[in-house]
Amino acid sequence: MRDNVVNELINLAKNDKDIVLLTGDLGFGVFEKFESSFPGQYFNVGVAEQNMIGLATGLALEGKKVVTYSIGNFGILRCLEQIRNDACYHDANITIIANGGGFSYGSLGMSHHTTEDIAILRSLPNISVVAPCTADEAGEAITSMIMNGGTGYLRLDKSSPKDCSSEDLFVIGKSRRYKEGKDITLIATGSILGEANIASVELKKFGIQARVVGMHSIKPIDADEIIDAVSNTGGIVTIEEHNKDGGLGSAVSEVCMDLGIKPNKFLRIGLDNQYSSIVGGQQYLRSKYNMDSKAIINKIKKIFKL
């Protein structure tokens, strides 16, 4: 995902000198071409995330289109006050990129497990929250976020699912359908969409036709797609590599409650309200915390009493 984002940034910066990239002393391998091509538009601020957001806000208020980059929790939790008071309060044109959503850096332990970010940031006014489901979406997302203006959070995974394609246009605030089905709708955000896709294929063996939706835009969220899932399928299952409290499942629930609609079946799949203290690779941790395709299948079979 990261490579696609950087390639898009390079293409955009060729025609727009106002695009500025700030990094918190990370990403050198992929930023070399950007730095050499646009030396006046690239700054390594060091391991100083609070200063990075402050600098980004100042540049944005002077008309620059700023992108900040760090990994996982570093570019969010270390500088949450600055994101709130500087960037969001001033509705500054800053796209905050965090590479390594969910368990992407699983082997580095809970300090690098990014599992509360969506819940925290979507509660702030004046910020969009986007978690691309595929590498192609990541490239489309950075372009849309910069062009739309305002403060945005772009959550990237280190992995990207294979065999996931949609003909729907990428629009912030709209989702994409990857498979059609009438019995249940699987709504996923981020690269864990791949697990939902695999599960949908296996569920056919049990007579369950699952619609698969990639909800890359969590804020603003696609309420129309949620309404359609409630009206035209047998229920909703949300799937996220994130704490269930405050994440995608909560956002979908809020839409249903606000609109007074009730899915026939409803299930949230994600991390329970706990710290992921186990160390391991992304796929291992998905399995350990019951959010891989096998766990998705078993949980859906259970709600269908199979």
Each predicted region: which residue ranges?
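Thiamine diphosphate
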Residues: 1-306
